[in-house]
């Protein structure tokens, strides 16, 4: 088999419609476009969303919200998620390797949600007051 000998299967392709080639063809005269009107003319189409002069839907509806540029750089982590990490000294790189935060994240904050039973040392990670109390209660420490 060669690339220049490949052909589609029999019946897989159809001849294109030949419009405007006489009344016997079924698509003669008006060529399937009907009589008169903008859509029957050559070049007679309007842009997407055009509603004949009526205010288009995308302009009638109000603009809403925005895409935060910093949202992807910040992440929050639960106390219970710290429990699953095998390492005791935790920094942002360890969290990325463990798959707990995305690779684009540069700021992490631990929130007091869930329980923690092992002592961990956090480096360069922010914590809430409740999370700080819970970590220090089990013998952990926090360094900035």
UniProtKB/Swiss-Prot annotation:
Ranges of compositional bias, category Gly residues: 21-31
Gene3D superfamilies in the record: 3.100.10.10
Keywords: Ribonucleoprotein, Ribosomal protein, RNA-binding, rRNA-binding
InterPro entries for this protein: Ribosomal_uL15, Ribosomal_uL15/eL18, Ribosomal_uL15/eL18_sf, Ribosomal_uL15_bac-type, Ribosomal_uL15_CS
GO-annotated cellular components: cytosolic large ribosomal subunit
A biological process term (GO) from this entry: translation
Region (Disordered): 20-49
Claim: Ribonucleoprotein is one of the keywords in the record: yes
GO molecular function, one term: rRNA binding
Annotated HAMAP family: Ribosomal_uL15 (MF_01341)
Subunit structure: Part of the 50S ribosomal subunit.
Family in the record: Belongs to the universal ribosomal protein uL15 family.
Biological function: Binds to the 23S rRNA.
Protein name: Large ribosomal subunit protein uL15
